């Protein structure tokens, strides 16, 4: 599901809100989540999961075009860990 599809689905379910209000709310939520992770903080949504940053160590990679070895710097990457309720719901739906 894309952000646009999420907004469309919410518009269909929340008929008392305008499409612009829903779009703004979704964008605000995502912006707040991104800025929280950017500042190094963790996000926990009970029953859904948590977002945090994991550090990837520097390593030697390979340029796929040339095959040359390339030094890759260490970096932080976003990580999502699903909560127990979400895992159970997904597994029961399959």
From Swiss-Prot:
Protein purpose: This protein is one of the two subunits of integration host factor, a specific DNA-binding protein that functions in genetic recombination as well as in transcriptional and translational control.
InterPro entries (alphabetical): Hist_DNA-bd, Histone-like_DNA-bd_CS, IHF-like_DNA-bd_dom_sf, IHF_beta
Keywords: DNA recombination, DNA-binding, Transcription, Transcription regulation, Translation regulation
Record's subunit section: Heterodimer of an alpha and a beta chain.
Keyword DNA-binding (UniProt): yes
Protein name: Integration host factor subunit beta
PANTHER family: DNA-BINDING PROTEIN HU, INTEGRATION HOST FACTOR SUBUNIT BETA
Gene Ontology MF annotations: DNA binding; structural constituent of chromatin
Organism: Vibrio atlanticus (strain LGP32)
Any one GO CC term of the record: chromosome
Record SUPFAM superfamilies: IHF-like DNA-binding proteins (SSF47729)
GO biological process, one term: DNA recombination
NCBIfam families from the UniProt entry: hip, PRK00199.1
Family to which this protein belongs: Belongs to the bacterial histone-like protein family.
Pfam family, one: Bac_DNA_binding
